[in-house]
């Protein structure tokens, strides 16, 4: 019985020590990162909104959200991406 109580105490202490790490500001960032970009433009009519990926991501990207809630990564340096962003800002 003492062995079980000791193990339980170790588990509880370990859990308590690890809990603050999950509350760090980095853990709350749920913005996805993109590792590849779409090759061709999407139809503009299919896009309802966009957002930029976090600065913590290795590749900068614009994420377009389609009317069906699909997220598509695009290269922010491409002309069509900038034009779509401008169009979305105007509407």
UniProtKB/Swiss-Prot annotation:
Molecular function in Gene Ontology: CCR chemokine receptor binding; chemokine activity
Endpoints of the signal sequence: 1-23
Pfam families per the UniProt record, alphabetical: IL8
GO cellular component: extracellular space
Superkingdom of this protein's organism: Eukaryota
GO biological process, one term: antimicrobial humoral immune response mediated by antimicrobial peptide
Descriptive protein name: C-C motif chemokine 5
Species this protein is from: Macaca mulatta
